[in-house]
Amino acid sequence: IDEVANGYARSISVELHKDGSASVEDDGRGVPVDIHPELGITGVEVIYTKLHAGGKFDHQNYAYSGGLHGVGASVVNALSKWLVVDSCTGGGHYRMRFESNYDPAEKKIASGRAVTPLERISATRKHGTRVTFLPDDTVFEETKFNAETVRRHLRELAYLNKGLSITFVDEREKDPDKQKTVFMYEGGLSDYVRYINRDKTPLYE
């Protein structure tokens, strides 16, 4: 959403897969893949393993923020069995995988550690980021996504970001006509007011 709010992206897709994982994709600039000058690791690893590393490393990059202050990506990674990042940026498609596994040396679960180096998959003209993750069932009692809860939240985000197109796909849905929903509201909040008043008689137009 930060990419959208700052004019770098116009569409987002959210997919719930049959294996319990979920994917979120945007058409923004893509997660940086260059080496961080101070930490000596790729931008993908910084953003997905370090707290407060959002904003593409530069606080001036975003005039507006969704409010998570750079912790969202790293927290999702830490709470996932595995997470795969696909970043399309600078003419290349890059991929990196993270997993949470037991570390015998430390005698504890090591959450969200990189298990593959950042790999350049191919050249591409595409730009944006796709993240696929599986919630960790050793952390959460319930890991099954509630489609209606996700759908409601995405609808609200579409209302709050006028002109943004959000596509929601639930692969678990048996009815093909209900698998895909697209939210896009050119009127923004005014459309939202009309939506919540759809079963009421308005006093003013």
Segments and roles (model prediction):
Residues K18-E38, G43, G54-E186, Y192-Y195:
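GHKL-type ATPase core
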Residues I1-I12, G72-L79:
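Conserved ATP-binding N-box helix of the HATPase_c
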Residues I47:
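Short basic (Lys/Arg) and small-residue
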Residues K200-E205:
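Short, intrinsically disordered, charge-balanced linker/junction segments flanking boundaries
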Residues V14-L16:
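Conserved catalytic core of two-component histidine kinases
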Residues I1-Y8, L51-H59:
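Structural motif corresponding to the C-terminal cap of alpha-helices
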